[in-house]
Protein backbone atom coordinates (compact mmCIF):
# COMPACT_ATOMS: atom_id res chain seq x y z
CA UNK A 1 0.00 0.00 0.00
CA UNK A 2 1.01 3.60 -0.33
CA UNK A 3 1.74 4.75 3.22
CA UNK A 4 1.27 8.39 2.26
CA UNK A 5 -2.38 7.82 1.33
CA UNK A 6 -5.10 6.90 3.85
CA UNK A 7 -7.35 5.36 1.18
CA UNK A 8 -4.55 3.07 0.02
CA UNK A 9 -3.89 2.02 3.62
CA UNK A 10 -7.59 1.35 4.24
CA UNK A 11 -7.77 -0.68 1.04
CA UNK A 12 -4.84 -2.81 2.22
CA UNK A 13 -6.73 -3.64 5.42
CA UNK A 14 -10.20 -4.17 3.93
CA UNK A 15 -10.04 -7.97 4.21
CA UNK A 16 -9.17 -7.94 7.91
CA UNK A 17 -12.41 -8.72 9.72
CA UNK A 18 -11.31 -8.95 13.35
CA UNK A 19 -9.27 -6.54 15.49
CA UNK A 20 -5.56 -7.34 15.54
CA UNK A 21 -3.38 -7.73 18.59
CA UNK A 22 0.01 -6.90 17.01
CA UNK A 23 0.94 -4.16 14.56
CA UNK A 24 4.51 -3.87 13.33
CA UNK A 25 4.77 -0.43 11.81
CA UNK A 26 7.93 -0.46 9.69
CA UNK A 27 8.19 2.28 7.10
CA UNK A 28 11.42 3.42 5.56
CA UNK A 29 12.78 5.46 2.73
CA UNK A 30 16.36 6.67 2.40
CA UNK A 31 17.20 8.94 -0.51
CA UNK A 32 20.20 7.45 -2.31
CA UNK A 33 22.81 10.21 -2.60
CA UNK A 34 24.63 11.52 0.44
CA UNK A 35 22.63 14.59 1.43
CA UNK A 36 24.49 17.76 2.32
CA UNK A 37 23.26 21.30 2.64
CA UNK A 38 24.64 21.99 -0.83
CA UNK A 39 23.12 18.95 -2.49
CA UNK A 40 19.82 18.29 -0.74
CA UNK A 41 16.63 17.85 -2.67
CA UNK A 42 13.86 19.36 -0.56
CA UNK A 43 11.13 17.31 -2.23
CA UNK A 44 13.01 14.16 -1.19
CA UNK A 45 13.49 15.52 2.34
CA UNK A 46 9.74 16.00 2.70
CA UNK A 47 9.01 12.59 1.17
CA UNK A 48 11.26 10.89 3.74
CA UNK A 49 9.46 12.68 6.57
CA UNK A 50 6.05 11.83 5.10
CA UNK A 51 6.91 8.14 4.69
CA UNK A 52 8.99 7.52 7.82
CA UNK A 53 7.33 9.79 10.39
CA UNK A 54 3.78 10.59 9.27
CA UNK A 55 3.08 7.34 7.40
CA UNK A 56 3.16 5.07 10.46
CA UNK A 57 0.72 7.41 12.23
CA UNK A 58 -1.61 7.15 9.22
CA UNK A 59 -1.50 3.36 9.49
CA UNK A 60 -2.50 3.44 13.16
CA UNK A 61 -5.21 6.04 12.52
CA UNK A 62 -6.72 3.95 9.72
CA UNK A 63 -6.61 0.75 11.78
CA UNK A 64 -8.23 2.57 14.70
CA UNK A 65 -10.88 4.22 12.51
CA UNK A 66 -11.70 0.80 11.04
CA UNK A 67 -12.00 -0.62 14.60
CA UNK A 68 -9.18 -3.06 13.85
CA UNK A 69 -7.11 -2.49 17.01
CA UNK A 70 -7.97 -4.61 20.04
CA UNK A 71 -8.88 -2.49 23.04
CA UNK A 72 -8.87 -5.25 25.66
CA UNK A 73 -5.30 -4.61 26.77
CA UNK A 74 -3.71 -7.11 24.38
CA UNK A 75 -2.94 -4.85 21.41
CA UNK A 76 0.74 -4.07 20.88
CA UNK A 77 2.05 -1.62 18.32
CA UNK A 78 5.74 -1.77 17.48
CA UNK A 79 6.99 1.42 15.88
CA UNK A 80 10.22 0.57 14.06
CA UNK A 81 12.52 3.57 13.92
CA UNK A 82 16.27 3.96 14.01
CA UNK A 83 19.16 5.14 16.09
CA UNK A 84 19.56 7.59 13.21
CA UNK A 85 16.83 9.65 14.88
CA UNK A 86 18.92 10.12 18.01
CA UNK A 87 20.69 13.45 18.40
CA UNK A 88 23.17 11.89 20.83
CA UNK A 89 23.99 9.13 18.36
CA UNK A 90 24.78 11.67 15.67
CA UNK A 91 27.32 13.33 17.97
CA UNK A 92 29.10 10.05 18.71
CA UNK A 93 28.67 7.98 15.57
CA UNK A 94 28.67 10.50 12.76
CA UNK A 95 29.62 14.02 13.86
CA UNK A 96 30.16 15.34 10.31
CA UNK A 97 26.47 15.78 9.51
CA UNK A 98 24.63 14.92 6.27
CA UNK A 99 21.64 12.75 5.35
CA UNK A 100 19.23 15.32 6.72
CA UNK A 101 15.91 13.90 5.56
CA UNK A 102 16.36 10.37 6.82
CA UNK A 103 17.65 11.38 10.23
CA UNK A 104 15.07 14.14 10.67
CA UNK A 105 12.35 11.68 9.65
CA UNK A 106 13.49 9.15 12.26
CA UNK A 107 13.71 11.81 14.99
CA UNK A 108 10.15 12.85 14.10
CA UNK A 109 9.08 9.18 14.07
CA UNK A 110 10.50 8.77 17.58
CA UNK A 111 8.54 11.77 18.86
CA UNK A 112 5.38 10.75 17.02
CA UNK A 113 5.64 7.27 18.48
CA UNK A 114 6.05 8.63 22.01
CA UNK A 115 3.02 10.87 21.60
CA UNK A 116 1.05 7.94 20.15
CA UNK A 117 1.97 5.79 23.15
CA UNK A 118 0.71 8.48 25.50
CA UNK A 119 -2.55 8.94 23.59
CA UNK A 120 -3.36 5.24 23.17
CA UNK A 121 -2.51 4.31 26.75
CA UNK A 122 -6.04 5.24 27.86
CA UNK A 123 -7.36 2.79 25.22
CA UNK A 124 -5.16 0.01 26.65
CA UNK A 125 -3.04 -0.13 23.51
CA UNK A 126 0.70 -0.50 24.11
CA UNK A 127 3.09 1.31 21.80
CA UNK A 128 6.82 0.71 21.83
CA UNK A 129 9.59 2.34 19.83
CA UNK A 130 12.05 -0.25 18.54
CA UNK A 131 15.40 -0.07 16.76
CA UNK A 132 16.18 -3.44 15.17
CA UNK A 133 19.86 -2.62 14.75
CA UNK A 134 21.78 -1.67 11.64
CA UNK A 135 20.39 -4.05 9.02
CA UNK A 136 21.87 -5.03 5.69
CA UNK A 137 19.12 -4.02 3.29
CA UNK A 138 18.70 -2.30 -0.04
CA UNK A 139 17.92 0.87 1.86
CA UNK A 140 21.26 0.85 3.71
CA UNK A 141 23.29 -0.40 0.76
CA UNK A 142 24.85 3.01 0.22
CA UNK A 143 26.70 2.27 3.49
CA UNK A 144 27.77 -1.23 2.44
CA UNK A 145 31.44 -0.36 2.95
CA UNK A 146 30.87 0.08 6.71
CA UNK A 147 28.37 -2.77 7.28
CA UNK A 148 30.97 -5.02 8.92
CA UNK A 149 32.70 -2.23 10.85
CA UNK A 150 29.38 -1.02 12.27
CA UNK A 151 28.04 -4.51 13.00
CA UNK A 152 25.25 -4.53 10.43
CA UNK A 153 23.16 -7.69 10.55
CA UNK A 154 20.98 -9.60 8.12
CA UNK A 155 17.41 -8.31 8.14
CA UNK A 156 16.23 -11.66 9.53
CA UNK A 157 18.26 -10.96 12.69
CA UNK A 158 16.68 -7.52 12.98
CA UNK A 159 13.24 -9.10 12.60
CA UNK A 160 13.99 -11.60 15.37
CA UNK A 161 15.06 -8.73 17.62
CA UNK A 162 11.76 -6.97 16.96
CA UNK A 163 9.71 -10.10 17.63
CA UNK A 164 11.60 -10.70 20.88
CA UNK A 165 10.91 -7.16 22.09
CA UNK A 166 7.23 -7.45 21.16
CA UNK A 167 7.01 -10.64 23.23
CA UNK A 168 8.21 -8.63 26.24
CA UNK A 169 5.61 -5.84 25.85
Predicted regions: what they are:
Residues 1-7:
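Rossmann-fold cofactor-recognition segment
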Residues 13, 60, 113, 159-162:
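Short-chain dehydrogenase/reductase
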Residues 129, 137, 141-169:
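C-terminal helical subdomain
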Residues 19, 23-24:
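Conserved hydrophobic beta-strands of the Rossmann-like cofactor-binding core
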Residues 82-84, 129-136:
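PG/GG-rich flexible active-site loop of Rossmann-like NAD(P)H-dependent oxidoreductases
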Residues 29-30, 36-49, 65, 69-122:
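Catalytic loop of short-chain dehydrogenase/reductase
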Residues 126:
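Short, small/polar-rich loop/turn modules that mediate ligand/substrate recognition or access, typified
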Amino acid sequence: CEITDEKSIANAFKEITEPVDIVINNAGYFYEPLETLDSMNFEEELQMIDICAVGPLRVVKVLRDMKLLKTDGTCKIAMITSQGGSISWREVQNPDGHDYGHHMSKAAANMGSKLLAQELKKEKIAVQILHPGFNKTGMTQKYEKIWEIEGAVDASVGAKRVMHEISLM
